[in-house]
């Protein structure tokens, strides 16, 4: 197979998993890294998992800069836009989180259009879809959008929401043949190829290390990173996927207390500090008035 795919953010939890699946499928893969210092580690990690990397190439490119994106897109049929702007400290002003996310996807779409890329698949998230649906009897679908002024919506979630909206606006307002689709994963867990994990792993970390003395009875939707990677490839290659959004989730929900119980039963050696005592919902509601994490947690009740 000579088709070339660009994957942005190749050193990340999801990005590296997508690269591994594409290489196993026989694609030529190019990936972007903010620094090529990570190139050897990415190759080593993939090789350690018995994945051949002869068809993998690298370009140094940053979502916040115009340089090198034309080079990254050259001869690519597909682009999987996985990377998000990186912040080591979350700025106080949410616009400093939102603006780079919007400008980043616009930068990718402009370069893809210029390079005559066939289709771009963007990694969005479920926070852009279902956080304004308060009716427990109704089902959130790809037709739904979260209200950007939803109380408790974090700057990160808002940045993903507004970046996806900006992407759809770009595609729909352009007179070109660029195809587009989005993947909207819920809490993404599963095995990592290296030490990089998703932000959703903070849920597990806080349960394992005893940070949560009482566990909020929050229902969660989760999805395996391997399924999300495969869904990106299906959205890339399936003709009917053009102009569509796809929620990535496993069947049903699991609560945080249920996750705590699973850790205790399945990995007791990790659960010496794991609490299974439930935090009453009204306490979480009270805490939401003063605590950012509690406010974000209340959003999921």
Predicted features and spans:
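Glycine/proline-rich active-site loop of Rossmann-fold NAD(P)-dependent oxidoreductases
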Residues: 174-178, 190-203, 235-246, 270
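Active-site Tyr-X1-5-Lys
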Residues: 150-180
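NAD(P)H-binding glycine-rich loop region in Rossmannoid oxidoreductase-like domains
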Residues: 36-37, 46-103
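Alpha-helical substrate-binding/gating segment
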Residues: 204-213, 218-246, 251
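Mid/C-terminal beta-alpha module of Rossmann-like enzyme folds, strongest
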Residues: 231-296
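Glycine-rich "substrate-gating" loop/helix at the edge of Rossmann-like oxidoreductase active sites
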Residues: 152-155, 190-196, 214-226
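N-terminal Rossmann NAD(P)H-binding glycine-rich loop of SDR-like oxidoreductase domains
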Residues: 4-27, 32
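Conserved Rossmann-fold NAD(P)-dependent oxidoreductase catalytic core, especially the SDR/UDP-sugar
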Residues: 81, 85, 90-156
